[in-house]
Each structure stands twice: as structure tokens, then as C-alpha cells.
């Protein structure tokens, strides 16, 4: 009986494993859809996960490091004590001359739980802030170098996309930005994460905060008031509960065209 079990176990080495080969001519939308569908039977994945997978595999443009910054921030926001493990186990990341670990260090003492963003939240906010776009499928195309006007793929677009995404993530994880945004949300009455029932609404609120902070369109105190009002109204009306990316895109377009104050 044991021999039979060992024979079957040994036979695993010669078993054919299902492999799906995708043509390089496929549109990125189709590849994204296949990625999400294949994984739908296990842990539910989304386009944010596909973006993370794509940047993690791109060492040429520093995508692998960007993935770590996003992943580590998300982890530390929930478990601050992870910082000590990170410092002792990922020396390569911690010794980066850019000093990324210093930008995450403040999280080791963070006890705030109102907004604990996941990886896809960070990607989405950074993308909306820097590109004034909302659909992550478009980000995937841009990371591949897609020129939306000529429909060609260009290296300079990949480089520009990574530069902007790095900047967007840096603004997201900035201690001052993050803490001031959380203060604004708490001042609006949302003092516990139990009261945060819409991740999409708070993601857009943070993107709006960063956009206004960068544009200097209004004063710092006015930024908080606008963000508070926008967040409360979006929650009460359920603005981002259905087809959030379409609603994001519409709002970002209007903000770009006429501003927020008007």
C-alpha cells in the first residue's frame, strides 16, 4: 500500500500542468479580465492586484521597489510592530539610497485606525491624484507604454508613468499629508473605522485632498472643509457605491475643468 502511495506521489513530476499561453497581441483589457477570472475561484482579486503584479515584475523601472513601498505601508498601517521585522529582514530595501524606509518609519508609532488603506487603495489614490484618471485598466496600459492618441507603445510613456506613480505614492505615504487628512475626516464626525462604510468614498476624499494641496487653489484650512463636505455628501448619497470608477472619472474631469470652488 505504501509503495502504491509513493508511486503516485513520484508520478506528480510528470503530470501536465495547465498553462494558458496568451498572445502578445492581446489588448491589456483582455489580459486583465483573464487574470481576474482565473483567480476568481480562489482569493478574490481585482484590477489593483493586477497592477501590483505588473509593477512587481518590472525591475527595469523600479516597479519591484514601488511594490514594496505600497505593500509595506499597507501592512504597517494595520500592524505597526511589523516595522522591526521589516528592518531586520529586508536589508536591501532598508539600505536603498532613496531612504524609503525613513518615509515609512513614522508608522511604527501609528495607532490611528480610521483609515487603514490596502494596496489597491494606495494605487487608486496615487493614480487619481497624479493622472486625474480613475480606471485602473488605463494605468495598466500606461505601465505598458500605451499612447492613447496614437495607440502605439512607447518607452517614454512607461518611464513617465512610473515617475508620476512614484510621486503619487510618496505623497500618499507622507506623514503630514496622511495625518492631516485623517484629522479632517475625524473632525467631520467619523472618529472610528466602524463609521467608514465606503472605501471608495474615502479614497476619493484623500485623492481630492492631495490634488487641492498640490494645486494651491484654496487655503489649507479651506482644503479640510471642502474634503469634509465632499466626503460626507458622497457617503450620504452613495455616489461611489455603484460604478465608482465612472463616478471618479466624471468628478476628476470636472475638477480639472472648473476646479472645486466653482
Residue positions per predicted region:
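A generic structural motif
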Residues: 44-59, 195
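Short, conserved secondary-structure transition motifs
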Residues: 52-81, 233-239, 254-256
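A cross-family structural signal marking well-folded subdomains
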Residues: 49-51, 89, 93-261
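Active-site-proximal loop/hinge segments that shape catalytic or ion-binding/gating pockets
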Residues: 3, 10, 70-71, 81-84
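Surface-exposed beta-strand edges and their flanking turn/coil or helix-capping segments
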Residues: 32-35, 60, 242
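Glycine- and hydrophobic-rich flexible loops that cap the catalytic core of alpha/beta enzyme folds
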Residues: 1-25, 29-32, 38-41, 45-48
Amino acid at each position: 500500500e505504501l509503495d502504491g502511495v509513493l508511486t503516485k506521489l513520484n508520478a506528480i513530476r510528470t503530470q501536465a500542468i495547465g498553462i494558458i499561453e496568451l498572445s502578445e497581441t492581446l489588448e491589456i483589457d483582455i489580459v486583465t479580465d483573464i487574470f481576474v477570472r482565473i483567480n476568481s475561484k480562489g482569493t478574490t482579486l481585482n484590477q489593483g492586484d493586477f497592477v501590483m503584479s505588473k509593477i512587481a515584475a518590472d525591475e527595469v523601472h523600479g516597479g519591484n521597489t514601488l511594490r514594496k513601498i505600497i505593500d509595506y505601508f499597507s501592512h504597517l498601517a494595520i500592524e505597526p510592530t511589523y516595522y522591526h521585522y521589516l528592518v531586520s529582514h529586508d536589508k536591501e530595501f532598508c539600505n536603498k539610497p532613496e531612504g524609503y524606509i525613513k518615509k515609512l518609519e513614522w508608522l511604527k508609532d501609528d495607532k490611528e485606525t480610521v483609515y487603514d488603506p490596502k494596496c489597491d487603495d494606495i494605487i487608486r489614490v496615487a493614480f487619481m491624484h497624479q493622472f486625474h484618471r480613475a480606471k485602473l485598466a488605463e494605468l495598466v496600459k500606461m505601465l505598458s507604454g500605451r499612447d492613447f492618441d496614437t495607440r502605439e507603445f512607447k518607452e517614454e510613456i512607461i518611464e513617465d508613468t512610473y515617475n508620476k506613480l512614484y510621486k503619487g505614492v510618496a505623497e500618499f505615504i507622507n506623514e503630514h499629508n496622511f495625518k492631516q487628512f485623517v484629522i479632517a475626516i475625524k473632525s467631520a464626525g467619523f472618529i472610528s473605522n466602524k463609521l467608514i462604510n465606503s472605501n471608495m468614498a474615502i479614497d476619493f476624499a484623500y485623492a481630492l485632498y492631495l490634488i487641492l494641496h498640490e494645486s494651491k487653489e484654496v487655503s489649507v484650512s479651506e482644503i479640510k472643509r471642502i474634503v469634509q463636505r465632499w466626503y460626507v455628501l458622497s457617503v450620504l448619497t452613495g455616489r461611489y457605491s455603484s460604478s465608482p470608477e465612472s463616478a471618479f472619472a466624471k468628478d476628476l474631469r470636472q475638477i480639472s475643468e472648473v476646479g472645486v470652488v466653482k
